[in-house]
């Protein structure tokens, strides 16, 4: 377990800390901050069916430590396949990872493969804008899942990111060490 996991599992947060956290979240949302702030915020019109569920899958780089240690057998392609199989009528958005777009990291970028499982690929858009389009975010370990939680979206995890297992997310895998129920 990590230091963060131990803090979350074993600490009681008083009203003052919770109030400070709430103010910080408000600032994050007000300024549309996320881990990657290099992409512009855009309003995109999706061509979906009426009442069609919209799912965002934020891509991840396969050699990232969170994927290696927390991916639990999932890679981006397996995630795409699993989400499509379990949500056949959904409109699925694939958000290419910023480090893959910039060419700095390796990741799934073959659109012919990606578009077998999703309806649209977004690249040059902020994660905040992408999250605003969806009803749910499905991820392995991406911090975009945490961004989505802050924005009151349903989040489904398939690996074990730091924010999974606390009652905030719908988890494909369970972490028996995480027994405390947290809130934002």
Residue ranges and their predicted role:
Residues 2-184:
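Catalytic-core helical/loop segments in enzymes performing group transfer/polymerization on anionic/lipid-linked
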């Amino acid at each position: 377990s990590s230091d963060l996991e131990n803090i979350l599992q074993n600490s009681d947060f008083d009203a003052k800390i919770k109030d400070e956290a709430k103010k910080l979240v408000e600032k994050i949302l007000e300024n549309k901050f996320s881990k990657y702030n290099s992409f512009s915020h855009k309003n995109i019109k999706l061509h979906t069916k009426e009442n069609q569920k919209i799912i965002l899958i934020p891509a991840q780089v396969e050699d990232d430590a969170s994927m290696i240690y927390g991916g639990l057998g999932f890679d981006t392609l397996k995630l795409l396949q699993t989400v499509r199989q379990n949500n056949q009528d959904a409109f699925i958005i694939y958000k290419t990872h910023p480090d893959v777009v910039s060419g700095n990291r390796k990741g799934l970028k073959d659109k012919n493969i990606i578009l077998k499982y999703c309806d649209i690929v977004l690249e040059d858009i902020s994660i905040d804008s992408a999250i605003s389009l969806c009803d749910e975010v499905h991820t392995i370990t991406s911090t975009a899942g945490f961004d989505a939680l802050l924005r009151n979206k349903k989040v489904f995890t398939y690996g074990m990111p730091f924010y999974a297992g606390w009652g905030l997310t719908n988890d494909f895998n369970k972490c028996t060490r995480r027994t405390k129920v947290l809130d934002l």
